[in-house]
A protein has these predicted regions:
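Donor nucleotide-sugar binding/catalytic pocket of nucleotide-sugar-dependent glycosyltransferases
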Residues: 154-165, 171-187
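Short alpha-helical segment that forms part of, or immediately flanks, the ligand-binding pocket
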Residues: 243, 265-270
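Charge-rich, low-complexity intrinsically disordered regions
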Residues: 1-60
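Membrane-proximal helix-turn-helix segments that form the acceptor-binding/catalytic region
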Residues: 134-155, 247
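Acidic donor-binding loop of glycosyltransferase active sites
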Residues: 247-260, 273
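Conserved catalytic-core segment of nucleotide-activated headgroup transferases in glycan assembly
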Residues: 183-239
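N-terminal pre-catalytic "stem/leader" segment of glycosyltransferase-like enzymes
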Residues: 53-120, 283-289
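Active-site proximal beta-strand in glycosyltransferases
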Residues: 102-104, 118-136
Length: 301
């Protein structure tokens, strides 16, 4: 038996018996019998001998072009309309013209989004935006459940948060690298050239402040009245002028519980501006208001 394990060190006799019904029906139920069967028959038949793939918590990302580089058309949800032009230009997409050809669908927020997916018979690549995959939200939960009924769909997660949420809903996504930041526009700024403001990302438009930690950042503002603040949803600036806004600030707050791609975080990272944000590798992590205030104090020096 020792010679056998020298030749087949990974042989798992219990696994070997459990995965083959014919062995159990033949009364093979112990180590010696399993080894004998494998030696006489299983080896020649290339039968499996042990578990190869086990649970793996390490998630590797794929370049998004590797997944959708061959696709020419896209559909962008109205829920992500502020990104539409940049998204289409970045990937050189055309508006959707054929329901039979592969198509990228960016965001699933509205009835129109679902109707477009339903009538598309070709291969569908859904790039989830963030809040549309938040199953704690009743609307998103309904959307996720409906999406499961579609066929010929590849799901793309642009953040680990989205990846985990989709997995928890029984959807197996591809985790992709997604960064549309124009680094010729968003360039590093020396720390001593940054302004004295605190930039708070609380959405593109008023009405969704709760998603970005309204109660938390308002507490921060009350406890730190000596600072001036810029709120994103009160700032109407063309995208190519955003670097001028960012460099007025020495730190950004994006206090989400769940998040998508966090484009503002990527832009700040490109400019070397610190960001308090839990859902990105770059962000400074926080658990409570005191943590946030401590980060602000350290970065203001």
């Amino acid at each position: 038996m020792s010679n056998f394990y020298e030749q087949y060190p990974k042989f798992d006799w219990k696994f070997y018996i459990n995965v083959y019904d014919d062995l159990r029906k033949a009364g093979i139920n112990n180590e010696q019998a399993a080894i004998q069967h494998f030696t006489n028959y299983g080896c020649k038949e290339k039968r499996r001998t042990h578990q190869i793939i086990q649970s793996n918590t390490s998630i590797s990302t794929l370049p998004i072009q590797q997944v959708i580089g061959h696709v020419n058309q896209c559909y962008v949800s109205d829920g992500l309309s502020t990104f539409r032009t940049r998204f289409m230009d970045f990937f050189q997409f055309n508006d959707i013209t054929s329901t039979e050809e592969p198509c990228v669908f960016f965001g699933v927020y509205t009835d129109s989004d679902l109707q477009s997916l339903l009538k598309h018979t070709g291969l569908k690549y859904i790039i989830w935006g963030g809040e549309d995959a938040n199953y704690h939200n009743g609307q998103a939960r309904a959307t996720l459940n409906e999406i499961k009924h579609l066929h010929n769909v590849e799901h793309l997660a642009i953040s680990q948060c989205i990846y985990t949420r989709l997995l928890n809903q029984g959807i197996s996504p591809i985790f992709v690298e997604f960064n549309m930041v124009d680094k010729t526009l968003f360039q590093p700024i020396p720390r001593n050239e940054l302004g004295k403001y605190i930039y708070i990302f609380n959405g593109q438009i008023p009405g969704r402040e709760h998603v970005y930690g309204k109660s938390v950042y308002e507490t921060v503002m009350k406890r730190l009245p000596q600072y001036k603040y810029i709120l994103s949803n009160q700032t109407s600036v063309e995208h190519d002028l955003m670097p001028d806004v960012y460099k007025q600030c020495f730190i950004m707050l994006r206090l989400t519980t769940h998040d998508g791609n966090a484009n503002s975080v990527q832009e700040s990272e490109a400019m070397d501006i610190p960001v308090i944000h839990n859902q990105s590798d770059y962000g400074l992590k926080w658990k409570n208001v005191d943590d946030i205030i401590a980060h602000i104090s350290q970065c203001s020096v």
